[in-house]
């Protein structure tokens, strides 16, 4: 019997094919990370950035700094932990610049599958324990399908029938957080971050996308946004068509 790793005469062995695919994926990943790292401002941030991205893709379960450090540098977990913690929590780099670099890299590939058809406004939630993570509160958690302790972010993605790309996101800061000065200070919330409704955040993301000249599509929202008359009127005033899902 011919084993699975022995190919037809003249054809590549399956293990060789897999090895080549893995090498190609690693090369594309390296090129992608290197391209994005130019948006970080300093060359010395490329190493922690690469480790952070590698950990996010290769680590199961919790995506906090501790397991990422253990997965990406098992022989020097403590040092890697400090490096990643500094990169994530203290390094001053622009998320807007990184998002722009992502768009420049990914959007042309998506548009090869067809023109952008939709701008999708959605909530993304992250279940959390405790009360010290920024914005964590008891609220509806989509991941769990019920009210629970979680963080929530408003996101904007461009999409066609081929793929989608997140182009904007903003953490929702509940009023109880926005008005709690000691809690804000302890968590490092910037002074210019104030309470905004999710609808107001979504409108800000739409205005930002228009200012960036991104290819337009129909604004898609769930009923939580679509039932807000002021939100619908504001979207119309921006010159954007919209529809809502149930």
Spans of model-derived segments:
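Conserved, well-structured functional cores that handle cations and Mg-NTP chemistry
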Residues: 3, 9-220, 224-246
């Amino acid at each position: 019997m011919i084993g699975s790793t022995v190919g037809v005469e003249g054809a590549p062995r399956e293990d060789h094919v897999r090895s080549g695919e893995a090498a190609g994926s690693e090369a594309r990943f390296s090129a992608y990370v290197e391209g994005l790292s130019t948006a970080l401002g300093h060359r010395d941030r490329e190493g922690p950035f690469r480790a952070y991205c590698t950990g996010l893709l290769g680590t199961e379960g919790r995506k906090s700094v501790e397991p990422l450090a253990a997965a990406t540098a098992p022989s020097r977990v403590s040092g890697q932990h400090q490096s990643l913690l500094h990169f994530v929590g203290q390094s001053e780099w622009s998320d807007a610049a990184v998002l722009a670099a992502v768009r420049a890299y990914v959007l042309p590939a998506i548009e090869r599958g067809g023109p952008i058809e939709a701008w999708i406004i959605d909530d993304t939630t992250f279940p959390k324990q405790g009360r010290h993570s920024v914005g964590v509160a008891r609220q509806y958690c989509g991941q769990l399908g019920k009210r629970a302790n979680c963080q929530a972010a408003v996101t904007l993605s461009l999409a066609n029938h081929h793929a989608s790309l997140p182009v904007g996101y903003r953490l929702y800061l509940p009023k109880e957080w926005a008005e709690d000065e000691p809690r804000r200070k302890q968590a490092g919330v910037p002074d210019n971050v104030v309470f905004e409704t999710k609808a107001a955040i979504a409108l800000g993301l739409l205005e930002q996308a228009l200012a960036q000249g991104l290819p337009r599509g129909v604004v898609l929202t769930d009923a939580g946004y679509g039932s807000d008359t002021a939100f619908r009127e504001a979207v119309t005033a921006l010159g954007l068509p919209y529809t809502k899902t149930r």
